[in-house]
Amino acid sequence: MSKDEEKEMSNDRYVSPLSERYASREMQYIFSPDKKFRTWRRLWIALAETEKELGLNITDEQIEEMKSHADDINFEVAKEREKVVRHDVMSHVYAYGVQCPKAKGIIHLGATSCYVGDNTDIIIMAEALKLVRTKLVNVIAELAKFAEEQKNQPTLAFTHFQPAQPTTVGKRATLWMQEFEMDLEDLEYVLGSLKLLGSKGTTGTQASFLELFDGDQETIDKIDPMIAEKMGFKACYPVSGQTYSRKVDTRVLNVLAGIAASAHKFSNDIRLLQHLKEIEEPFEKTQIGSSAMAYKRNPMRSERIASLSRYVMIDALNPAITSATQWFERTLDDSANKRLSVPEGFLAIDGILDLCLNVVDGLVVYPKVIEKRLMSELPFMATENIMMDAVKAGGDRQELHERIRELSMEAGRNVKEKGLDNNLLELIAADPAFNLTLEDLQKTMKPEKYVGRASEQVDAYLKNVIRPLLEKNKEILGVKAEINV
């Protein structure tokens, strides 16, 4: 087929946006047919080696023949065979046997389809989780850098998206960071607990191996541990039906959903801050925000994070429902759903983390805008301190509290109804009950006096939690994201 024909075919078929627009080539390869079927062959080799080492009549020559064709998969032979037998595993057993005539008779010996299918799924999920882990650690590293840089920048905090006691930009970043750190804990736990299915037969009883090994229970007990070791795992699940428990997929996708929730919260905050013109995500010189409104600088990357995150959070329902509805030792209604939900969950979270890396690395902070908004609200925040100063000057606390309430309401009406600046300080200075000058009041208008321990909390969190985490993972730091659109 010519390149023009290939291009034409690609334009008249549906192509998943996850592959075309969002996920990295690295993650796409993990879920590619090439990766899948190479892993099948590695598993068949591991099984043959195990069976030989445990006494079955399998030769070194047969195993070497299998190894020599582990990576050159004859896809077309398998595809044509599947048209005849309607079974993907047996099609690839046949194709492998075509390349390995001496080993043909011992390929897949004693195994079921789930031996290659399910073990491969776990191997691929483990590899995909490692890639997610790498990117997640780098997102945390970028947020740590941002928090350190901005730890002393006072900013108006919001509760209910209404002005609240000030914090710092860096302290706010630690809130995003802590959620990603929690996700990393969950990921490492689930990744560390993954085991292989092993080779347990059609209903998990290893009946076929009783026949192969003449009922030798001690020998059969060695099969799964040996396969696990050859494939780089510590163990196999001790019991199973035909498949590994679909609860495993639920745990894995719940980790992805947790990351998606953290990313969504982060992206929402950036979108709101960009509306306030306090912080912006990166915006290229040639980037277009709107086809009609040329002045627009839309937070489209943060919006895309939110969009993909919703997909991942909903996608996590799929394995949960699949796990809940499996009958007895296995039903096949897991298969089609699993082929979609697991890869697409990983491809989407990969795109999300690339976007997070890109956004955090290029965040633009506008201190003057932040200061202007903070100073417009600070007189309200400072009223308690003002009242204390007035009491020291001889005032009555209860009377002063009522006067501040009344003057605050008046200043609020001036802002909301008349569009004026906040003149609360002027109103207080003009009220003889306070016995304070405007100069006295303006001395209290120092934002750093109202941020509490925000800066110190950033220092402590970075020192005690984040820097040890990054030191532990220093070999995977330095990843930069590339986004396609």
Describe each region flagged by the PLM.
Residues 2-207, 213-228, 289-290, 300-304, ...:
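A helix-coil-helix interface module used to build multimeric assemblies
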Residues 280, 403-410:
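Active/binding-pocket-proximal capping segment
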Residues 225-242:
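A short, charged helix-loop
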Residues 311-397, 403:
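Long, amphipathic alpha-helical stalk/connector segments used for oligomerization, subunit docking
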Residues 243-278, 287-348:
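A conserved active-site cap/scaffold subdomain adjacent to cofactor or substrate pockets
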Residues 148-170, 280-296, 329-336, 361-381:
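Glycine-rich cofactor-pocket loops
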Residues 28-32, 77-79, 287-307, 329-344, ...:
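Short beta-alpha connecting loops at secondary-structure transitions
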Residues 86-89, 136, 140-143, 147, ...:
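Alpha-helical transition-metal enzyme core signature, strongest for iron centers
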